[in-house]
From Swiss-Prot:
Protein origin, superkingdom: Viruses
Biological role stated in the UniProt entry: Transports viral genome to neighboring plant cells directly through plasmosdesmata, without any budding. The movement protein allows efficient cell to cell propagation, by bypassing the host cell wall barrier. Might act by forming tubules structures that increase the size exclusion limit (SEL) of plasmodesmata, thereby allowing viral ribonucleoproteins to spread directly to neighboring cells. Binds to ssRNA.
Record protein name field: Movement protein
UniProt keyword list: RNA-binding, Transport, Viral movement protein
Record-linked Pfam families: 3A
InterPro entries xrefs: MPV
Annotated source species: Groundnut rosette virus (strain MC1)
Positions of region (Disordered): 230-260
């Protein structure tokens, strides 16, 4: 006996699969598979991939369908991609640990290995692979069971109210009547290559525009007879006393009106 499977790789496909059983507006608010922000403003931060109220709504909808009547649908995540971005300088202390958690597990235990790395090592790209699906009808501690991303800041302390780092979580769900269970694939991590900000003083035109926007030289002598910077040597070399090259703005020559 075959059973009908309601799958959803994206929110649009889920709406199509359940058309007639639920209004579009009911599932437009589920935020399935969207970019989920995660602020590291506390030492330990827990971000459910499916908020409890949303999960209860989806489970209630899927319980109306015969294949998912007893489970409320089985949620499977093929992968969870996380982008880590620090908000501190490169010499800031501390480490960060990130892992995926199943709320059925006690003490925020991880599903598979955790990833640990220095806070000051620049942005990173991570991927986690939950190897099994969970019933949306399940409850854990009177709350709907869910997968979550957990982060912990180690070996450092910062002033309260700020975020030393952020995570951006990307995932796409599959909700169906069939269960998934695979061998554990360890998480992966790659550093994101960074470059320097463009030199703001690299061109003469940009230096002139910055100076003109903040300093007036309308009372200066002409460019042919500028004021000495620090002795004749510095003036001739075009350098300040510190050895830094300087720029003397051009003075506008006075206009002479011709006699008529």
């Amino acid at each position: 006996m075959s059973s009908q499977v309601a799958k959803a790789a994206t929110q649009g496909e889920l709406l199509e699969a359940l058309y007639g059983e639920v209004t579009v507006q009911e599932l437009q608010e589920t935020n399935l598979g969207v970019l989920t922000p995660h602020r590291g403003d506390q030492r330990v931060v827990f971000t459910p991939l499916l908020p409890p109220r949303t999960q209860t709504r989806i489970s209630g909808v899927l319980r109306r369908l015969r294949p998912t009547r007893n489970t409320g649908g089985l949620l499977y995540l093929e992968k969870v991609v996380v982008v880590f971005t620090p908000h501190v300088p490169d010499d800031a202390p501390g480490e960060v640990e990130v892992w995926i958690h199943d709320s059925l597990l006690p003490n925020l235990n991880s599903v598979g290995p955790r990833l640990r790395f220095p806070l000051n090592g620049g942005p990173r790209l991570m991927a986690f692979y939950p190897p099994y699906s969970i019933p949306l009808m399940d409850k854990s501690k009177e709350m709907p069971r869910c997968f979550a991303i957990v982060s912990e800041l180690l070996s450092a302390s910062y002033v309260g109210g700020g975020s030393p780092f952020s995570l951006h979580i990307m995932w796409q769900p599959q909700v169906e009547s069939l269960a998934h269970n695979y061998l554990m694939r360890p998480p992966r991590m790659q550093k994101i290559c960074r470059g320097m900000v463009k030199d703001a003083l690299g061109s003469l035109s940009s230096r002139k525009s910055y100076i003109a926007g903040a300093v007036s030289h309308r009372f200066a002598l002409t460019a042919a007879n500028p004021l000495p910077i620090s002795g004749d040597t510095a003036e001739e070399a075009g350098e300040a006393s510190s050895g830094e090259p300087h720029w003397v703005p051009e003075a506008t020559a006075p206009r002479v009106r011709k006699a008529t």
